[in-house]
Amino acid sequence: MSAEQPMRVVVAGAGVAGLEAALALRELAGDLVAVELVAPESEFRYRPLSVAEPYGYGEMRRFPLDRLVEAAGATLRTGSVSELDADAKEVTLTDGTTIGYDTLLVATGVGTPEAVPGALTFGGAGEREAIGALLDRAKAGEVKRIVFTRPPTPLWPLPLYELAFQTAERLTDELARGVQIVVATPEPAPLDLFGRAASDEIARLLEIRSIEFRPHVGPLRWEDGALHVAPGGSLAADAVVSLPRLVGEPIEGLPQDDSGFVATDELGWVLGLSDVYAAGDITDFPVKQGGIAAEQADTVATAIAADAGGGRPPADLRARSAGPVADRDVSPLPPERA
């Protein structure tokens, strides 16, 4: 990069973190940077509303990705990064194309494979139809006990409780009687991630809705009407709905742990590499949530902008995502659900 040329910033991924970083860089650095996003998809999907979709409360919103990227003052390349050469400052796409960069931001998000064999995975293909079919079976008296569970791995746990509450609400509204709903998780208390006060409130709401809570449960598999759990034993279940396991997509040359996550410092620098950052669900931050991804992206963008000659200096930054979730303004349930 010369004094006359903008810094080439390549962003791998165009989810919340990737788009937020592009927007922040436009605001903070302007023409000092040339931002290119690389992503395989053509749409940006706003996932939070997907929890309500099977119950008729809303639909997952979709936006043309090219328009969002253009509005952020960046360019979009269709593809997926498969390899990183940090010494050469190049990434290689799955089709063999190489792209040079001055600074790289890895914001590729995560994959969502099945966590509990035999269970209905929320976040998998056909989830809306599958949950709709489960509700129909419960209303018909074919399902008497539904267990909602999650793996003991980093994720955003709130959707599990939303699914349980909305299932209870729908079955009550449609006068389906005799269906027991259970939330079985590795947590010691409901949504303990949010702190004691929020956890106590969720426990109260579960009790009001006659939803059983089973703590310290590590789901293994569902078969023959039983959810087998660690460290041993099983729970009776006519149906099981599980959140997926989250795994980072492998990129050769990028330091990743066994789950595919990337370790960074407080500014988002990937440990062990120069001029490579990471933000969003691909990082090893234990909570995976869009608001946290956006804050991480803002932190990274501020550091990149400062390096390019614009914005605030990195010394002024604080890793806002490093604090406990209980200290953040994240409501455990939307007001209309409480």
Write out the residue ranges for each language-model feature:
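Beta1-alpha1 glycine-rich phosphate/pyrophosphate-binding loop at the start
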Residues: 2-74, 152-193
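C-terminal, flexible cofactor-proximal segment of oxidoreductases
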Residues: 301-338
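Active-site substrate-recognition segment that forms the wall
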Residues: 153-155, 159-176, 260-262, 269-277, ...
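FAD-site-proximal beta/loop scaffold in flavoenzymes
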Residues: 115-142, 234-296
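FAD-binding core/adjacent interface of flavoenzyme oxidoreductases
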Residues: 2-6, 74-162, 169-173, 241
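A Rossmann-like FAD-binding core segment of flavoenzymes
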Residues: 34-36, 75-92, 99, 169-266, ...
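Conserved beta-strand scaffold positions in the cores of enzyme catalytic domains, especially
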Residues: 37, 76, 119-121, 213, ...
